Amino acid sequence: MAPKAKIVLVGSGMIGGVMATLIVQKNLGDVVLFDIVKNMPHGKALDTSHTNVMAYSNCKVSGSNTYDDLAGADVVIVTAGFTKAPGKSDKEWNRDDLLPLNNKIMIEIGGHIKKNCPNAFIIVVTNPVDVMVQLLHQHSGVPKNKIIGLGGVLDTSRLKYYISQKLNVCPRDVNAHIVGAHGNKMVLLKRYITVGGIPLQEFINNKLISDAELEAIFDRTVNTALEIVNLHASPYVAPAAAIIEMAESYLKDLKKVLICSTLLEGQYGHSDIFGGTPVVLGANGVEQVIELQLNSEEKAKFDEAIAETKRMKALA
C-alpha cells in the first residue's frame, strides 16, 4: 500500500486552517501546518485532527515551527507573507508595498524547498501571486511543471457563482475563463462563457441577462476581495477550496483543466513570465499549457496584464 501523501502548508493563517480541514475531509494525505508563530500551528493541527472522526478519514495533522519538516513533502502550499503593509491603513497601502516584504519571504522559503523537498509540487498563494510564484520558482529550483500560482480557479469561481445566481442555475453548470493575471488586470473572456454547454450569448439574446448586467458582474468579480474586506472580513474559504481543487488534481492524477499562473514560454507572445492560462494538472504537475486563441481586444488586455506583472516584478 502506498503511503499517504505529505502536504505541507507554509503559512497557518485563515486559509491554511481551512485547507487543512478540507484535506482531512477529502482524505488527501497527512498535513503539516507550518508557521513562524510559536505554538499556533500546533493548536490548529490538534483541533483539525479531531475532524477525522466526522470525515471518516485517518489523516495525521501536525504543527511545526521548523522548515526541517518540509522534508519529504509531496505538495507544498505557500500562503505565508504579508497581506497588507505594516503601519499603513487600508486606504494608504497597495500591492506594490508588499513586493519587497514578500520577496524576502519567497527567497527564504525557496531555499528550504530546495534543501528539503526539491521534488515537491508547489502551489503559491502569496500576493502579488504572479510575481511571487516566479520568485519562488527561481529560488527553489523546482522544474517549471512543478510550480503554479493560484488565480483563475478562484477568480472564475466568483464569476461563475454570480452568473449562476442571475440565471438561477447550478453554479457548476457555468463555465468561464479568466486569464492574464490575478488582480485588477485580470482578463474576463465573455465569449468563452457557457451555461450547461450553451453559449452565454443565447441567454443574452433571450433577455435572461443583459450586457449591462454582465458588465456589472465582471466589475464585481474583479473587486470581490475588496468587497469582502469592506464588510470587515477577509476572503479565505473560497481561496482555500480553490487551492485544494488544484492540489487534488495533482495528487489524484485527475488531469483537470484549471486556470493557473504558470510559466509562459511563447504562449500569447510572452516568455520568461508567469501568467494565467488554462493548464492540465495531473501526476506530472502541469502536463499541458493551453493557449487560447484571443481576438485583438482580448490580446491587448492580456498584454496589459502581463505588462503589470512585469512592472511589479521589476520592483521586487
Swiss-Prot record:
Any one GO BP annotation for this protein: lactate metabolic process
Swiss-Prot/TrEMBL catalytic activity: (S)-lactate + NAD(+) = pyruvate + NADH + H(+)
Residues given in the record as substrate binding sites: R95, R158, H182
UniProt cross-references to InterPro entries, sorted A to Z: L-lactate/malate_DH, Lactate/malate_DH_C, Lactate/malate_DH_N, Lactate_DH/Glyco_Ohase_4_C, Malate_DH_type3, NAD(P)-bd_dom_sf
This protein's pathway: Fermentation; pyruvate fermentation to lactate; (S)-lactate from pyruvate: step 1/1
This protein's UniProt keywords: NAD, Oxidoreductase, Pyruvate
Domain of life of the source: Eukaryota
Binding positions (NAD(+)): 14-150
Keyword NAD included in the entry's annotation: yes
Enzyme nomenclature, EC number: 1.1.1.27
Molecular function in Gene Ontology: L-lactate dehydrogenase activity
Residues at the catalytic site: H182
Similarity section: Belongs to the LDH/MDH superfamily. LDH family.
Quaternary organization: Homotetramer.
Protein name (database record): L-lactate dehydrogenase
Source organism per UniProt: Plasmodium falciparum (isolate CDC / Honduras)
